[in-house]
Amino acid sequence: MASAQDGSMEEILWRSPAHVQMMGGFLHSNNILFYFAESPFFDATSNNASLAIQANYNETLRHFVETREAFEGRLKTMQGLEFVVAYDPLQAAAQTETSFAHEPSNIWVIRKQTRRKRAGLEDEVVVLSTYFVVGDCIYMAPSVASVVGNRLLSAVTSLTSLLKTASSLPSFTPSHGHTYLPPAPKPTDSSQPGAQSQQSKENTPMPDADSTKALLVGPQTANAGAILQDTRTFAESFSLLARYGEEFMDENPLVGEPGSFILSKSGDTDRGAASKQPSNVNRPGSIPGKVGTPQVKVDTPGKTPEKGATPSASDDSKIRKKKAKIGN
């Protein structure tokens, strides 16, 4: 409940020109706390309210409300909730020190705090909230959690809006992939609408002829090399076809039409025919061997035959015929 009330108090502004006129027409150090006591930010159960009521009915305590120094000095002797001035622009302007980098402002800073007495030690003070008095307007300073939460909410809201807008932008094409902006085709026809507005008023300088030729040397050389390679590949393929076009890798080549191929037996037939051929048949293209001359045995009277000489086949046949005649 208290946090909800503090959250609502951070959003309001309070001012009362009538009370300013009743207090002399302007705010100063001795009436700033009493002007603050008229605002909704003030707590009636604080020590400030108790001391003011006691001073109204007790003459011995009246001097405590005449000056702010006396009033805050009396509050320091009490414990509980209190409101004190943390920054006085009039006192800052009256100081002779030149420690201020800028001119003193007219902003008053008032703190709401609790004081607890400790025996033999200084009082324990806990600041609950801070208020600003600008002119006759009173504001409540937001807490750190409120400031950080507001900034986070603003950032998240902006990111949510961005994601909603960006979710409809990406598109996918096989040529470019995922892109947020589809590639726009470049206009090539000068007769299209808007082409005249894109043209430059001044003549575009043309590149030199030498530089243009130098740029074309590379592509022309690459094209010539590709054409030469294609021609060489075609010639090699044609040569392989002419040399090995009639050969088969299978022993039994396939014959027939697609869908009804059969294995032929021409390979087996050719091997059988080759094995039956005589070995002395000269192959085409081979050199024929020389035919041996038959030897003729001549018997010379009075001369013994040479050792190691063997009768020929014709001599053996003649001897056999003679023996057969003698036997008859």
Curated annotation (Swiss-Prot):
Its main location: nucleus. It is found in: Nucleus. Residues 188-203 have a biased composition (Polar residues). The keyword Cell membrane does not apply. Disulfide bonds: none annotated. Pfam families: Med6. Keywords: Activator, Nucleus, Transcription, Transcription regulation. Residues 319-328 have a biased composition (Basic residues). One of its GO terms (cellular component) is mediator complex. GO terms for biological process: regulation of transcription by RNA polymerase II. GO terms for molecular function: transcription coregulator activity. Coiled coil: none annotated. Component of the Mediator complex, a coactivator involved in the regulated transcription of nearly all RNA polymerase II-dependent genes. Mediator functions as a bridge to convey information from gene-specific regulatory proteins to the basal RNA polymerase II transcription machinery. Mediator is recruited to promoters by direct interactions with regulatory proteins and serves as a scaffold for the assembly of a functional preinitiation complex with RNA polymerase II and the general transcription factors. This is Mediator of RNA polymerase II transcription subunit 6.
